[in-house]
C-alpha cells in the first residue's frame, strides 16, 4: 500500500475500531479492579465479585459507567459518520440503490442502539438497555452481511474479493457468536456467554476497521456556498451542477 496515494479518510474506520476497543477494555479493567465483575479468565465466581464479565455489567457502576457512556456515544457518532460516507461512496456505483440504502439504515439503527445501551445502564433501566443491545447486535449483524455483499458486487478498484471474502468470514463468525451467545445465556452458562460476547464485539470492531481498504481511495469534502435569493433557472442549475459533478464528495 503506497501511503502517498492513500486518502486520510482511511484512518476514520481505524480510529473507530481502535478507540472503541481500547475504551471498552478500559471499562473492563476498571470494573475488575473495583471487583464489580469477574475477570474473563476466571474459572468460577469468587468471593466479593458481583457479576460475570458481561460488557453491560462492566459499565454498570461508576466510575466505569461514566467511561462506558462516553465511549459508546463517541462510537455511535463515528459509526454514523462511517455509515453516511460509505453510502455516498457506493451511491454512484450501484444500479439498484435498495441494498445501499438498507446498509445505511441498518448502521444508523445500530448506532442509535449504541447510545441507548451506553446511556441507560442495566440496573437503572434494563428494558431500554436491552432494546439498545438488540438494536446494536441485530442491525450490526445485518450491516455486516449487507456491506459484505456490496463489497463483492461493487468491486472498487478490483479489490472486491480481497476485501469481501474476509468480510463474509467475519460476518459468519459474528452471526455464529450471536447465536451461541443467546444459547449460552438461555442455559445460564454465563462465564462462557460473556467471553463469547467480548469476542463478538471485537469481531464487529475488526469488521468496520476493514472499511479502510476502500476509504483510502476516496476524498470527501464539505462544500459551503452562499445562499442565493434569486433562484437559478433549470438550465443554469444543470450547467452549474455539471461543472462540479465528480465522484468525490
Swiss-Prot record:
Extracellular-side positions: 31-64, 119-130, 190-192
Give expression by tissue: High expression in the epididymis, pancreas, dorsal-root ganglion, eye, brain, and spinal cord. Expressed in muscle spindle afferents (at protein level).
Output one GO BP term.
Answer: proprioception
Under Gene Ontology molecular function, one entry of this record is:
mechanosensitive monoatomic cation channel activity
The phenotype of cells or organisms lacking this gene is: Deficient mice exhibit loss of coordinated movements and abnormal gait.
Keyword Transmembrane in the entry? The reply is yes
Segments crossing the lipid bilayer:
10-30, 65-85, 98-118, 131-151, 169-189, 193-213
Gene Ontology cellular-component terms listed = lysosomal membrane; plasma membrane
Q: On the Cytoplasmic side, which residues?
A: 1-9, 86-97, 152-168, 214-249
- Coiled coil region boundaries: none
Miscellaneous note of the record: Tentonin comes from the Greek 'tentono' meaning to stretch.
What family, per the record? Belongs to the DRAM/TMEM150 family.
This protein's name: Transmembrane protein 150C
Tell me the organism. Mus musculus
Gene assigned in the entry: Tmem150c
Amino acid at each position: 500500500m503506497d501511503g502517498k496515494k492513500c486518502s486520510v479518510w482511511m484512518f476514520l474506520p481505524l480510529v473507530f475500531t481502535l478507540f472503541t476497543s481500547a475504551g471498552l477494555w478500559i471499562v473492563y479493567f476498571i470494573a475488575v479492579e473495583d471487583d464489580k465483575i469477574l475477570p474473563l479468565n476466571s474459572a468460577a465466581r469468587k468471593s466479593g465479585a458481583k457479576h460475570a464479565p458481561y460488557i453491560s455489567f462492566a459499565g454498570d457502576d461508576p466510575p466505569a459507567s461514566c467511561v462506558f457512556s462516553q465511549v459508546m456515544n463517541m462510537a455511535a457518532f463515528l459509526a454514523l459518520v462511517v455509515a453516511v460516507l460509505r453510502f455516498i461512496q457506493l451511491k454512484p456505483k450501484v444500479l439498484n440503490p435498495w441494498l445501499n440504502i438498507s446498509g445505511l439504515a441498518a448502521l444508523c439503527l445500530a448506532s442509535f442502539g449504541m447510545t441507548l445501551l451506553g446511556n441507560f445502564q442495566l440496573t437503572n433501566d434494563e428494558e431500554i438497555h436491552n432494546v439498545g443491545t438488540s438494536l446494536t447486535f441485530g442491525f450490526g449483524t445485518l450491516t455486516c452481511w449487507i456491506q459484505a455483499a456490496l463489497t463483492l458486487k461493487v468491486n472498487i478498484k478490483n479489490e472486491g474479493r480481497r476485501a469481501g471474502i474476509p468480510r463474509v468470514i467475519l460476518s459468519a463468525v459474528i452471526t455464529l457468536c450471536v447465536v451461541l451467545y443467546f444459547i449460552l445465556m438461555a442455559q445460564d452458562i454465563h462465564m462462557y456467554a460473556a467471553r463469547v460476547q467480548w469476542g463478538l464485539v471485537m469481531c464487529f470492531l475488526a469488521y468496520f476497521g476493514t472499511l479502510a481498504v476502500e476509504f483510502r481511495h476516496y476524498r470527501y469534502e464539505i462544500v459551503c456556498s452562499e445562499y442565493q435569493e434569486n433562484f437559478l433557472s433549470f438550465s443554469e442549475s444543470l450547467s452549474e451542477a455539471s461543472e462540479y459533478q465528480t465522484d468525490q464528495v
